[in-house]
């Protein structure tokens, strides 16, 4: 302890910054010198783990008492996660106001506010804010004549827009936004989504099954990465355009694979995709080098055949099951018919073939054997039996594949 006490205060504060905030606060009982050291921490993390009384009353009282007196001139990050009814919207509103006055860089709020606003209009003019993460909150009173000039990362999870406000109104005051993640659960107030952000580089959009959605419109000319999880089973419009710089896409379309989605991703170099639908003729993925295809659904092989045919420069092929699709895996696959002619990528470019969750269904074997027989420039193949070995053991898988292959490959 004597050695630690010999360190300067700024170094002790740096050490405290590596432990959870509540642990840092607990060091205040060590000595008079340590009593207020934690109050110089630039990063504050308040969650329900602070509870020492029923509900979050202990946390509420602690923040009310100490946040206004916090000594750090800049609060680099403030994280608050709690759904306790003891903490009111006006409490959070006050804490956010203090953080803004201390030039907060990163703000992470998770609190169900029951359609009550937790943001003052002045918040939307915060010049220092770089990252904003909101969960289960309500947004209203979004002024149009101000902006968040430094905001680059925005995450919205189950955020409600009321009184006619919309996602696009928020996006329109974020002139340098680069990373946007939207997880939609606001069924009542949002029937359509519009995302028009000229500066955006990365977009993740999740659309749930139960939502009665009219459609979504996306215009992001600088986008380089797209993650689209469209699980909606209702017929809806989609318009995705103006993505000339897109290089990587993750598309999980549970029911429909809109034409505009395919049109927007033909320039990618890396594609991860799961869909029960094909996409029709007339599309070519000339730049696609790395394809990961999820085969959880029965008709996945037909999509594989299309993509092999339309990706003449494919170098890496990975067949797998997406992590959250394990429960959707069917007993059999349908729709695998060997192409009438061997795809160009198998003849000239495919070098790596991976199948990390090989299930051993008859169709799985047919696909694997077809690729191994016809890939003329294959350098590396990795096929691993499904960890649970639901359909085939590792030993049986190896035996079946070796028996099916010609001697020159074995």
From Swiss-Prot:
Matches recorded under InterPro entries: F-box-like_dom_sf, F-box_AtFBL13-like, F-box_dom, FBD, FBL13/AtMIF1-like, LRR_dom_sf, LRR_FXL15/At3g58940/PEG3-like
FBD domain ranges (all copies): 335-385
Chain ranges of the F-box domain: 1-47
GO CC annotation, single: peroxisome
Organism domain of life: Eukaryota
Alphabetized CDD domains for the sequence: F-box_AtFBL13-like
UniProt signal peptide: none
SUPFAM superfamilies noted in UniProt: F-box domain, RNI-like
One Pfam family per UniProt: FBD
Protein name: FBD-associated F-box protein At5g38590
């Amino acid at each position: 302890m004597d050695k630690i006490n010999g360190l300067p205060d700024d170094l002790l504060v740096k050490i405290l910054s590596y432990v959870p905030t509540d642990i840092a606060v607990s060091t205040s009982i060590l000595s008079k010198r340590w009593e207020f050291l934690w109050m110089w921490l630039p990063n504050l993390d308040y969650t329900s783990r602070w509870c020492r009384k029923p509900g979050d009353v202990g946390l509420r009282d602690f923040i009310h008492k100490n946040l206004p007196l916090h000594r750090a001139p800049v609060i680099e990050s403030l994280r608050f996660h709690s759904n306790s009814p003891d903490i009111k919207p006006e409490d959070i509103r006050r804490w956010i106001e203090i953080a803004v006055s201390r030039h907060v860089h990163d703000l992470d709020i998770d609190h169900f506010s029951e359609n009550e606003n937790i943001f003052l209009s002045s918040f939307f003019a915060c010049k220092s804010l770089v990252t904003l993460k909101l969960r289960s909150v309500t947004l209203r009173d979004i002024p149009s004549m101000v902006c968040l000039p430094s905001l680059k990362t925005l995450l919205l999870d189950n955020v409600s827009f009321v009184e006619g406000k919309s996602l696009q109104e928020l996006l329109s005051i974020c002139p340098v936004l680069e990373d946007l993640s939207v997880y939609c659960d606001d069924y009542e107030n949002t029937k359509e989504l519009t995302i028009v952000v000229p500066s955006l580089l990365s977009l993740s959009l999740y659309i749930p099954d139960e939502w009665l959605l009219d459609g979504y419109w996306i215009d992001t000319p600088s986008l380089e990465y797209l993650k689209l999880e469209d699980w909606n089973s209702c017929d809806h419009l989609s318009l995705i355009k103006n993505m000339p710089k897109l290089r990587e896409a993750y598309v999980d379309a549970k029911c429909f694979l809109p034409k505009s989605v395919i049109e927007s991703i033909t320039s990618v170099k890396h594609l991860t995709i799961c869909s029960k639908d094909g996409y029709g003729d007339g599309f070519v993925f000339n730049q696609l080098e790395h394809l990961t295809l999820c085969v959880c659904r029965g008709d996945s092989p037909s999509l594989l055949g299309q993509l092999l045919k339309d990706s003449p420069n494919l170098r890496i092929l990975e067949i797998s099951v997406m992590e959250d699709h394990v429960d959707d895996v069917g007993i059999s696959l349908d729709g695998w018919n060997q192409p009438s002619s061997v795809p160009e990528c198998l003849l000239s470019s495919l070098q790596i073939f991976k199948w990390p969750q090989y299930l051993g269904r008859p169709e799985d074997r047919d696909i694997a054997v077809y690729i191994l027989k016809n890939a003329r420039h294959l350098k590396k193949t990795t096929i691993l039996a499904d960890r649970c070995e639901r359909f085939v053991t590792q030993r049986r898988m190896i035996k079946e594949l070796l028996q099916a292959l010609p001697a020159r490959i074995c």
